[in-house]
Amino acid sequence: MSSLVTPQHAEELSTGARQLGVELSAQQHELLLGYLALLIKWNKAYNLTAVRDPDEMVSRHLLDSLSVMPFIHNDTQRWLDVGSGGGMPGIPLAILHPHKQVTVLDSNGKKTRFLTQVKMELKLDNLTVIHSRVEEVQPEQPFCGIISRAFSSMENFTNWTRHLGDSRTQWLAMKGLHPADELVALPADFTVESEQALTVPGCQGQRHLLILRRKA
């Protein structure tokens, strides 16, 4: 274990994952802590996250990302994390689902350099890092799932990514407060499939997950 990661961090991750109903193997637990160590190390120079205190990163980043894992369907193979920033939730998604192909996308070169370093150091062969604006990405085939965490408004999230999915794609928007005002401006060809209020161990404030579909 890296000197940047404490036994308390390890225990908080184990306990929190159990409370979320997410089963972690020993290898997944180790990889998540390895990711945390890299996040702590690189954040000092690269400003990857506004969370400066490493003791807050387990709950506000790792567990917050794990909270949506029960809603990731097993039969969805290709996922895109839009505006991934420091890698949430894309890196935890790739760690927990090694047989899924996960792409993390960000327009900030410092952040994609960090994500590339995480891919190399943790040997995440199922992870692809793209440095680009989302509007300029042209995938060979539609993604099965497109997810964002505090990326933009619901209107922008759906409009900017509509070309990356189809009627079979799930769009997952991770939000704090319920975005009722944003849903009013949702494009007409998108519908809300479900809304989930999430409780993240160690996190104050509201958390919501909205799952969307696009009409054919």
From Swiss-Prot:
It is an enzyme of class 2 (transferase). GO terms for cellular component: cytosol. It catalyses: guanosine(527) in 16S rRNA + S-adenosyl-L-methionine = N(7)-methylguanosine(527) in 16S rRNA + S-adenosyl-L-homocysteine. InterPro entries: rRNA_ssu_MeTfrase_G, SAM-dependent_MTases_sf. The keyword Aminoacyl-tRNA synthetase does not apply. It is found in: Cytoplasm. One of its GO terms (molecular function) is rRNA (guanine-N7-)-methyltransferase activity. S-adenosyl-L-methionine binds at G83, M88, V134, E135, R149. Specifically methylates the N7 position of guanine in position 527 of 16S rRNA. This is Ribosomal RNA small subunit methyltransferase G. It comes from Pseudomonas entomophila (strain L48).
